[in-house]
A protein has these predicted regions:
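C-terminal and inter-domain tail/linker signature
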Residues: 1-155
Length: 155
């Protein structure tokens, strides 16, 4: 799975949203996800059902916004598992450039951001059945110049 993260159809010359979507549907990741997979993201992203739901509601917008990203420079350096559960994480775990408004709708800043992300997995029938993904969105937005806590305090 790790090697498949390096496949970036969104960076190909002439790539369109539809062509990237189709390549993600046909991406090697399909061999790792259970047909009834559930993906649970943080507030602002929500839950996705099935691979197509995951692609449409999280993966495609994320990849279109953060085309220039590096998983390995700082990386998911913690990997543990027990029985049917596993987890990866890092503090910070992804470095990326904010390049479009597809993810969360904020205008592109072209700022380099780091992301605090963890993935918790439930495996069933040899495939990933559920994936919980806490993403520190408040921290990402702060790096883009949006102080969510200050905005809440002002209300």
């Amino acid at each position: 799975m790790q090697r498949s993260l390096d496949i970036k159809p969104e960076t190909e010359t002439g790539a369109t949203k539809d062509s990237v979507r189709q390549k993600l549907i046909n991406h090697p990741q399909k061999d790792y996800w259970h047909p009834k997979m559930m993906w649970y993201g943080p507030c602002g992203i929500g839950t996705a059902r099935g691979l197509k739901g995951f692609i449409e509601h999280h993966q495609l917008p994320f990849r279109l916004t953060f085309k220039e990203r590096n998983y390995w420079k700082i990386g998911h350096y913690i990997e543990i598992g027990d029985g049917n559960y596993s987890m990866t994480g890092g503090w910070h775990s992804i470095q990326a450039t904010h390049g479009s408004s597809d993810w969360l709708g904020y205008e592109p800043t072209n700022k380099l951001v780091t992301m605090r992300v963890m993935d918790f997995y439930l495996h069933n029938e040899g495939l990933i059945r559920e994936n919980w993904v806490p993403i520190d969105i408040v921290h990402i937005l702060f790096q883009l110049g949006i102080d969510v806590l200050e905005l809440v305090h002002k209300k």
